[in-house]
Amino acid sequence: MKKLVLLSAFVLLAFQVQADSIQNTDEEIKTEEQPGEENQAVSISFGDPEGYALQDAAIRRARRCPPCPSCLSCPWCPRCLRCPMCKCNPK
């Protein structure tokens, strides 16, 4: 019976030592990962509002309507209201 108690105490002591060592390494990792003052304020910008306007204009230029059936020489559809020279463009 005494052997069982001593063995249990020894196993519990081993688990406690192992848990303490894991806790210490976790605390060391947390202190190493804290950023310095120079790394705290970082802003990243991938464009500005003017860039968005240029992208929108490029998309609009690339998207053309099919020629309207009454005016095959006009590359714009009369519904787009972009071709002022088209006679089929309702104004």
UniProtKB/Swiss-Prot annotation:
This is Alpha-defensin-related sequence 12. It holds the Pfam family Defensin_propep. It comes from Mus musculus (Mouse). PANTHER family: ALPHA-DEFENSIN 1, ALPHA-DEFENSIN 1-RELATED. GO terms for biological process: defense response to bacterium. Keywords: Antimicrobial, Defensin, Repeat, Secreted, Signal. Apparent precursor of a secreted, cationic, proline- and cysteine-rich peptide that contains Cys-Pro-Xaa repeats. Unlike cryptdin, the proposed mature peptide region lacks the structural motif characteristic of defensins. It may have microbicidal activities. Residues 65-88 are annotated as: 6 X 3 AA tandem repeats of C-P-X.
